[in-house]
């Protein structure tokens, strides 16, 4: 395999895990260590620009005003939250300015300066080795190709992990994330922050309560196309002094530096297969999460895709993915579709849904339109006299922590239905680290979402429908596609 090592093919994976029967562990892991009521977690963070800086600000109780794509106004009376102890920061980039929109308000260099007490690293492996006995928990906010390697390395050392979505860059990585979290007894949370929102809870209650009858379909259309495919650049400009290119590449195959791969340099790593899975990998975690929760989905039976011919280097600008899920107890089989690009799915094209709706659940008695912060029963006339049931799903533990008048007044007015959820989701993880309380998006639950997203990408790249044997982690109808379930790792970066 030239210079690459295939560390986790299916046979070795199943062998290391003791066979397939023990893989589906759904319970949330309990904290491996007990904490005094006022004791601070010792937190390390890997990936501290962009969303990483925002994750840190919440966990450390920092009074900052930025968020990628949004600005928040800090209330004058804002209390410091639990204010965890930030002991180590790791990023491959320490520039103090950035050229792309997502990172321009919080480049890594500024985050390093914001926490001067934290020890600084550029290689997460060295950080975990040198500070093993000084770190309790790790926050991972890197490009997608590093999510699982860092999270797994931390969990194997007994560290609690909060990882941004999607959490895995291959099907096998998604399975392994849930398995190792359960084996090590650590608290985990995938960064699908909207799971903590009141709106998602109301949608789950409506669907499980039979508001639209038996749900047979869910269609997701986040609108917006990806970037048109392109070839790998031939130019090899010098690596910026502030960028550690080898550490940026991490486990993925070597390629010379070019700014198109680095968001901090004005590029977009998400569109390159070696670093991400495009729109599906970027946003699928948020959108699939609601369907998995409400409909009790786990593993699809099959997946097929439609789109332009697969490009070997870059992800597609348009893509349609169709998953078939089996019946679950009394719940009927479900078709789940994902579409990104300018052409809407048929159900959106045939109905005059409001522009805010990115998802629709179709049941035997009607439809339910959804977004992060609202829902609507459809057709409106049929449900004009519908009265929603009283809330029955308790608020997120973390959301309860943040329910203080100062926060509610400042953030709920600015980001209806979202501001508090973002805080609550992270505080839920903090509570789990300290007390062993459950997290809603622990890797036992969210690992199946990671697998499903990556299986869709594999089906597209394989160019054929995949019939999926989840218990044995294999494609049954197209054996050649099994090579796409894992990825090669460079020596020294394997899992």
What are these regions (language model features)?
Residues 160-162, 167-250:
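A contiguous active-site-proximal alpha/beta segment in oxidoreductase catalytic domains
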Residues 93-96, 121, 141-147, 167-169, ...:
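Short, solvent-exposed turn/loop segments enriched in Gly/Ser/Thr/Pro and often Arg
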Residues 202, 213-444, 450-495:
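Contiguous beta-strand/loop segments that form the cofactor/metal-binding neighborhood of enzyme cores
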């Amino acid at each position: 395999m030239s210079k690459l090592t295939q560390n986790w093919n299916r046979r070795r994976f199943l062998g290391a895990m003791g066979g397939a029967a023990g893989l589906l562990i759904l319970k949330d892991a309990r904290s491996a260590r007990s904490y005094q009521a006022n004791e601070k977690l010792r937190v390390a963070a890997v990936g501290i620009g962009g969303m990483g800086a925002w994750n840190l600000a919440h966990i450390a109780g920092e009074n900052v005003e930025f968020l990628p794509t949004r600005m928040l106004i800090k209330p004058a009376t804002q209390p410091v939250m639990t204010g965890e102890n930030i002991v180590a920061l790791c990023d491959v980039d320490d520039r103090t300015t950035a050229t792309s929109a997502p990172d321009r308000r919080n480049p890594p260099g500024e985050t390093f300066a914001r926490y001067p007490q934290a020890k600084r690293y550029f290689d997460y492996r060295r950080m975990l080795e040198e500070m093993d006995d000084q770190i309790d928990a790790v926050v991972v906010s890197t490009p997608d190709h590093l999510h699982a390697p860092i999270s797994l390395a931390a969990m194997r050392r007994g560290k609690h992990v909060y990882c941004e979505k999607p959490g895995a860059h291959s099907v096998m990585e998604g399975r392994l994330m849930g398995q190792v979290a359960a084996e090590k007894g650590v608290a985990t949370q995938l960064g699908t922050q909207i799971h903590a929102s009141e709106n998602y809870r109301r949608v789950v209650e409506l669907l499980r309560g039979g508001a639209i009858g038996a749900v047979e379909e869910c269609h997701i259309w986040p609108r917006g196309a990806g970037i048109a495919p392109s070839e790998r650049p031939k130019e090899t400009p010098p690596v910026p002094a502030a960028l550690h290119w080898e550490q940026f590449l991490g486990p993925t195959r070597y390629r010379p530096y070019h700014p198109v791969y680095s968001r901090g340099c004005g590029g977009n790593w998400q569109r390159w297969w070696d670093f991400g899975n495009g729109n599906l990998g970027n946003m699928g975690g948020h959108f699939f999460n609601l369907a998995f929760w409400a409909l009790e989905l786990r593993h699809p039976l099959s997946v097929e895709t439609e789109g332009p011919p697969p490009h070997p280097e870059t992800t597609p600008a348009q893509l349609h993915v169709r998953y078939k899920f089996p019946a679950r107890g009394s719940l009927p089989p479900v078709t789940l579709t994902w579409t990104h690009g300018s052409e809407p799915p048929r159900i959106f094209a045939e109905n005059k849904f409001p522009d805010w709706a990115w998802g629709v659940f179709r049941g035997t008695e009607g439809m339910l339109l959804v977004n992060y912060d609202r829902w609507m029963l459809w057709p409106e006339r049929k449900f004009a006299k519908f009265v929603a049931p009283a809330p029955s799903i308790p608020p997120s533990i973390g959301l309860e922590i943040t329910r203080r008048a100062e926060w509610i007044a400042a953030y709920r007015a600015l980001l209806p239905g979202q501001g508090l959820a973002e805080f609550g989701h992270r505080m839920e993880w903090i509570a789990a680290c300290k007390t062993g309380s459950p997290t809603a998006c622990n890797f036992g639950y969210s690992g199946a979402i990671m697998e499903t997203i990556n299986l869709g990408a594999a089906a597209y790249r394989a160019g054929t429908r995949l019939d999926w044997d989840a218990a044995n982690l294999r494609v049954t109808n197209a054996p050649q596609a099994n090579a796409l379930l894992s990825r090669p790792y460079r020596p020294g970066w394997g899992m």
